[in-house]
Amino acid sequence: MATLRKVVKGLVVVVAGVIFSLGARAGDDAPLSKEQIKHFLQTAEIIKSKQSSKGVTHPWRLTLSDGTLTHDASFQPVDEHKAEMKLESGKVELGFVDSYKYNIAAYRLAELVGFDDMMPVYVERKWQGKTGSLSWWLPVKMDDAERVQKKIEPPDPDKWNRQMFRIRVFDELVYDSDPNLTNVLIGEDWTVWRVDFSRAFRRNKELRAPKDLVKCDRQLLERLKALNAGELAEKTKNYLTKDEINGVMARRDKIVATFQAMIAQKGEKEVLY
């Protein structure tokens, strides 16, 4: 499987905003806020289900309804822990974890650093006796694997690249051991989302692919600098261990140091946007 860092022009993202306009509308036809989406995902009745053939964990596509709104969601109950695991790449990982908890942790971390505009809302929910992550189903036309296979170029390369840089930074922060192009979803208007972090949050304190850090969004860098271990621990309680949080903070330090060194060498205009 091609990885994110093998794509030259890369990955992608969305514009920030408090309102999550994903085709979802309230009864008065106003777009739903993220808090309204969270409430819907946690409380709406599940009326239909179908298992996906995509991905390693084969998540479920559930249809939810609260009597006014009907919308789909992705349910991922995987919570696998192994002392040793041979990955698809052929590498062997010790202390392997593949867990829905990391999806929720990634979203909560994203909220802290201003990256949640690039992800669907994730909550925890129980269904058919299993607890898992439930995320808002996104209106997409293809994933990035399909885009690469069909050799489709983005209509706005500069915007694409700027958003690519943001995803690369976040991927280094969470240390996803399985970043692949099927986890990048592209909407009709080329809005893009990064999904599925079930193999993230490794305890490594080194960066996974430091060469991927080329440029950085100014606001994202400032939010990274302000990230606090205590706040992160509180926000991800029951989802991340102390060692996993320490890994995030150590990688944060290295990300910030990397960009500060680049700014000192090249100048701010060449590094930040």
Residue locations for each model-derived region?
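Helix-centric, low-specificity signal for extended rod-like, repetitive segments
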Residues: 2, 18, 244-245
